[in-house]
């Protein structure tokens, strides 16, 4: 299902565990330590993964502004110049690692920046950022825990941004409720990982996990859930955009497949985040039996993710 050279799978039980394994793979494969991540990221709740969200960040994590067009680093720039501006942040992080004698291990992003609020990003950013990282001796890790398994209208989020990673982390939908995650990588990186480290998990790589994961893939393919995501997702986004025009406090509506993001703001023409409204909306929806969440740097973006059979 993955693009070459992602042909080796290491199984785990949670997205957090998958990210831990991915970071370890990157560090062992490169001999580096430094990881570049976004400034509004969430990749798990273990000691190492939560550091990327709440710190301490230094010395081995460098957070960079996530790319976006709604609330960009600088207003009114042409898209190519805005892309270059965000790429400068990647270059800055690489330089700071070098200045502090910390070899670069890699860059870790969610393939669609889901926790950042599913922003529309400057065209070409991901692929160009990946090139910068690889030229500096690092590898590219993409987190598909939220985006993977057809959620976005493609099998993988990295397909949307045309950027194949060196290491990919998967979770959540992989087991459709059963504790199952995985890390995909190349044979070369997998070989180094197993030669230089020891990984064991009592409940990972079991026949039951394999059966559950295979069943999930069967359902996705046999029921054409990818096709359903695209047709229903387009309809859902169009409907949300339609009613959003009636409300001043909706600044933007974005979406990929069955993943719709609604940016809550203080009022029409304003880009000031409205976290209070987002929290209230999440609670009101819960009272009506519909579970959504709020995300983004300011927790003001509503995340709507219906099941793929929606």
Residue spans for each PLM region:
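Conserved N-terminal phosphate-binding loop of PLP-dependent enzymes in the Aspartate aminotransferase
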Residues: 1-310
